[in-house]
A protein has these predicted regions:
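The serine-hydrolase catalytic nucleophile loop
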Residues: 46-59, 73, 255
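Short beta-strand element of the alpha/beta-hydrolase
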Residues: 34-45
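Conserved alpha/beta-hydrolase "acid-adjacent" motif
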Residues: 250-256
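Alpha/beta-hydrolase-fold enzymes
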Residues: 127-206
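Catalytic nucleophile-loop/oxyanion-hole region of alpha/beta-hydrolase
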Residues: 50, 76-111, 115, 281-288
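N-terminal cap/lid segment of alpha/beta-hydrolase-fold proteins
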Residues: 1-35
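Short beta-strand/loop motif that positions the catalytic acidic residue
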Residues: 237, 243-245
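Conserved alpha/beta-hydrolase
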Residues: 60-80
Length: 298
């Protein structure tokens, strides 16, 4: 991951869903305090926290002259909220909506020039937010989780049975929450072990500079997955959207047939020969970034 040390950092907090959420706004080092910059709101994936997997993109966007905000969802990273490490996609979308309002309120941000950026699970949230905010300049989603049912069915049956069993137990059992690994080495138990997930996490740790990563997710979180299907709302997107799908993605299978069936003229689709985590790293990262910068400069 590329360093963010050349960007000016502005820390802040906002309240969402009863929790105090941590946010970081990155602006170009040479930006004036009275300058209003075009901005990007970054929405991370399933087990994401600030800087993990996103810092190379964030740095590049700041270098291109944008103000870029990352944030932690309630119960994750530097944000407050209990219980910890839970995921509910509908709640997360509401939190992201509040984060968007927070970004618009920042003095160095041009509120009428905001682009949403989402990766993996966050890509699904961007679809949902884009349908609610026709005033936004645009949206970018990469390796998006558009169909939770397809992602669920792509899980090996024995693994799926264990995930659902633990999720159900966590949902209904009184007492302490049950946690499962968010990421795991290939073949080991966790919510993500395919497509080089473990190796990607180890690389992402370098960007956290000793901050650490709590590699757990509440087991009941997996029960939401098959019911979360943002592709069904893709037809309602009315702002320019760049969608980069990976044809070899086995974590969040790219449902290109469903996207084509929707046929939304506002959505530009680029398919790349890659797995779920390839776009974050060389050799694919520069090409993926180039597509996104071209879209942002349109």
């Amino acid at each position: 991951n590329i360093s963010l040390e050349r960007a000016r950092t502005i820390k802040s907090t906002f309240m969402a869903e009863g929790a105090l959420c941590a946010a970081t706004l990155y602006v170009p080092q040479d930006a004036r305090p009275d300058q209003e910059l075009p901005a990007i709101l970054m929405l991370g994936g399933w087990g994401s926290i600030q800087r993990a997997m996103t810092s190379s993109f964030t740095h590049s966007f700041v270098e291109a002259g944008f103000a870029v905000m990352e944030f932690d969802y309630p119960g994750w990273g530097d944000s407050g909220g209990f219980p910890r490490q839970g995921i509910n996609p509908w709640r997360r979308t509401r939190v992201a909506d509040t984060a968007l309002a927070h970004l618009k309120s920042q003095s160095m941000v041009a509120a009428h020039q905001i682009t949403l950026w989402g990766t993996s699970f966050g890509g699904g949230h961007v679809v949902d937010l884009a349908t609610q905010h026709p005033e936004l300049k645009g949206a970018i989603i990469q390796v998006p989780m558009l169909d939770g049912l397809a992602a669920t069915l792509a899980t090996p049956p024995a693994r799926l049975l264990r995930l659902v069993s633990l999720g159900t137990l966590d949902q209904f059992k009184p007492g302490a929450q049950i946690y499962i690994p968010t990421l795991a080495p290939e073949g080991e138990f966790g919510t993500m072990d395919r497509d080089g997930a473990w190796d990607a996490m180890e690389v992402a740790m370098d960007a956290l500079k000793g901050r650490g990563y709590d590699n757990r997710v509440a087991a009941k979180s997996v029960l939401t997955m098959p019911f979360y299907r943002p592709w069904l709302r893709l037809k309602h997107v009315k702002i320019p959207m760049l969608m980069i799908g990976a044809t070899g993605d086995t974590v969040a299978p790219f449902v290109s047939d469903k996207v084509r069936r929707v046929g939304n003229p506002h959505v530009q689709v680029i398919e790349i020969d890659a797995n779920h985590f390839d776009p974050y790293f060389d050799p694919l990262f520069p090409g993926v970034l180039a597509h996104q910068l071209k879209f942002l400069r349109r």
